[in-house]
Amino acid sequence: MGKWLGDRIAEGMPAHELGVFVRSSGQLRRARAAVKAASLTAVELSDKVEITAGRVSIGAMHLAKGLEFRAVVVIACDDDVIPLQQRIENVADEADLEDVYNTERHLLYVACTRARDHLLVTGVEPTSEFLADLA
C-alpha cells in the first residue's frame, strides 16, 4: 500500500487527493502505517470534513460519504473486519442479520466509490466475502 501511495505521488498527485479508508477506528493504525511507509503525512478525518493540503486523509468508512479523492485505498478488508464481527455477534434475529449485512456492504461500497481515478482494495486472507461484489 505504501508503494501504491508513493506511486500516485510520483505521478504528480497531491497528497490531499489521496484517501485511505478502514472499516472502523480499530484499523486506523494500519492506515497510518501505510501512509508512513510512503513517507507521507496523514490527517485523520472526523465528522467535520477536514481535507488538509499536503496530507493524506485517513478515516473510517462511515466518514467517506460525500467526499471524493483522485485515489483511494480501502484497507483491512479482512473476513473478520468487514462485516464487523462484533455487529454480527450482537444480532438477535435473522432480519437484523440481514440489516447488518446490508449496512456493512453499503459502507464498503461508499468507501470504494470515493475514488475518482484510482482504487486499491486490500485485505489479508481470508478476505471479506463482500470483495466478490466489487468484481
Task: Describe these PLM feature segments.
Residues 1-42, 47-50, 64, 100:
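Helicase P-loop NTPase motor core
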Residues 56:
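Short, conserved active-site loop motifs that form the nucleotide-linked donor/cofactor pocket
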